[in-house]
Amino acid sequence: FFMISFVTGLQNPFGIIVKNQFAASNFMSQLGNAANFIAYAFMGIPAGMLLQKIGYKKTALLAIIVGFCGVGISYLSGVAGSYAVYLTGAFVSGFSMCMLNTVVNPMLNTLGGGGNKGNQLIQVAGSVNSIGATIVPVLVGYLIGDAAKAQISDANPALFLAMGIFAIVFIVLFCMQIPEPHMVKENEAKTPDKHSALSFRHFILGAIAIFLYVGVEVGIPNFMNLFATSPEIGIDPTVAGSIVGTYWFLMMIGRLFGASFGAKISSKAMLSSAATVGMIFILIAIFAPATTKVSMPVFLSDISFGMVEVPVGIMFMALCGLCTSIMWGGIFNLAVEGLGKYTA
């Protein structure tokens, strides 16, 4: 979960770098994120088939190798100064993130026994996910300094850190034993199954909900960063990275709440409440004038909090982190409930 958030989170501050290094539009600066998540559409079903055929462990190891290569390509884009190579790296990284999500989510839900307990375990792991997401924008914002002069190569330490994490986790995972409850046995593979996860209506609705959720979860901090660093607002990239880091920090707080009460509160109630409050926050952010400013506590690079003056809309976008935090686990838990052998 930490690796997923760390690598996915790189696309957010990289959007600022790409915008300035290649004089890209806001749309082009977000294509890295788009490429990262479009990869899910290509890899989702193959990843599930891999999980059934070779199991959790081998699928995860393969995902780590692909992720290492994806981050390596991102590093090469800085060396070559190529926008196309940057997009390729983001796309390849997306393959890895999709495969890792395919492994960790059903595994945690299964280990928790499904239901509220399964949701609780996913929320605990999600807290670790949020730690990685909190670190990335703060770290890269600190590394690039002046956004107008930022280059992809300035963020090399973050890329090296990501590759190092991949390498360490690969070694640790290679030496571990992991249960394989969803691996299809050879005799079962020969018998065609007329049904699949797509036979369940709630699974299809869950897949649509996850698709929409990911766009919201990642889109909020991305456009918050673009808005904060725009000439009209003029917030320093390092400070903007800290503001975005606060969004992810609030996601961690929300997931710790979900982990604490996930066994007592149903996924449906938790999801409905979070979505309603999140919509209210977004509406306030949309209609609040940019000239109205407030002092907002932000998570800084020295692992402390400081006060920064921001438009009130940015503060409410950051507060959305509390709402989006528990939505992934709730959606996934409800979507796979009762799938049995089709969970993978």
Question: Where on the chain are the PLM-derived regions?
Answer:
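Extracytoplasmic
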Residues: 1-24, 101-105, 220-228
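Central cavity-lining transmembrane alpha-helices of secondary-active solute carriers
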Residues: 31-49, 245-257
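Extracytoplasmic gate region of multi-pass secondary transporters
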Residues: 11-12, 198-245
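Hydrophobic core of transmembrane alpha-helices in multi-pass small-molecule transporters
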Residues: 83-100, 297-328
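Intracellular juxtamembrane helix-capping segments at the cytosolic ends
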Residues: 99-113, 325-340
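C-terminal ends and interior cores of transmembrane alpha-helices
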Residues: 65-80, 277-306
